[in-house]
């Protein structure tokens, strides 16, 4: 009976110790799961810092993109402003060149070389034909690199070979003018001859009583 009692005691003690060890293991496992599920306050504090640090490069990248876009826009605006300034400078230079005596802008100017007198205040004839009063009467002037003279009949410059001596009208216009004068003189003489003939015929028929025949 003593051996049976001892065996029972040993079994009960071993079973209780095993149960205690199992309970300890279960408690340890439960404690481990709870620690994994519920983070500590220090870990909670670290999380926003990690998130902020992870987002910092992204924000920096966005700022870099905006700064690069701003730099591109600034470069484009500066290039456009420089081109507008250059265009304004070219326009100013063109206006300055047009104001010179040899320029094509402004009012009419004398076409004689080394003259270029402004004819804005000159007479209508001089403005129309682009010649000053002095060079319109000069016997020899230089126009377009040629020795020429202003024709009073054509109102333009001709080379000296088209004039006779010191005449101020070209040979062709003088010939036409002389031809018209001769024709006009011939017509006048013919009319006078006809009129005298009519008068003579009338006087010859006065004694006969017949009316004179007249050509009208």
Swiss-Prot record:
UniProt tissue specificity: Ubiquitous.
Zinc finger (SBP-type): 107-184
Binding sites annotated in the UniProt record for Zn(2+) 2: 151, 154, 158, 170
Residue segments, region Disordered: 32-110, 175-216
GO molecular function per UniProt: DNA binding; zinc ion binding
Keyword Metal-binding: yes
Entry-linked PROSITE patterns: ZF_SBP (PS51141)
Compositional bias per record (Gly residues), positions renumbered to this chain: 94-108
Record's note on what induces expression: Negatively regulated by microRNAs miR156b and miR156h.
InterPro entries associated with the record: SBP-like (IPR044817), SBP_dom (IPR004333), SBP_sf (IPR036893)
Bilayer-crossing regions: none
Annotated residues for binding of Zn(2+) 1: 110, 115, 132, 135
Signal sequence annotation: none
Alphabetically ordered keywords of this record: DNA-binding, Metal-binding, Nucleus, Transcription, Transcription regulation, Zinc, Zinc-finger
Function summary: Trans-acting factor that binds specifically to the consensus nucleotide sequence 5'-TNCGTACAA-3'. May be involved in panicle development.
Comment text on domains: The SBP-type zinc finger is required for the binding to DNA.
PANTHER family given in the database record: SQUAMOSA PROMOTER-BINDING-LIKE PROTEIN 13, SQUAMOSA PROMOTER-BINDING-LIKE PROTEIN 4
Name of the protein this chain belongs to: Squamosa promoter-binding-like protein 13
Species, as recorded: Oryza sativa subsp. japonica
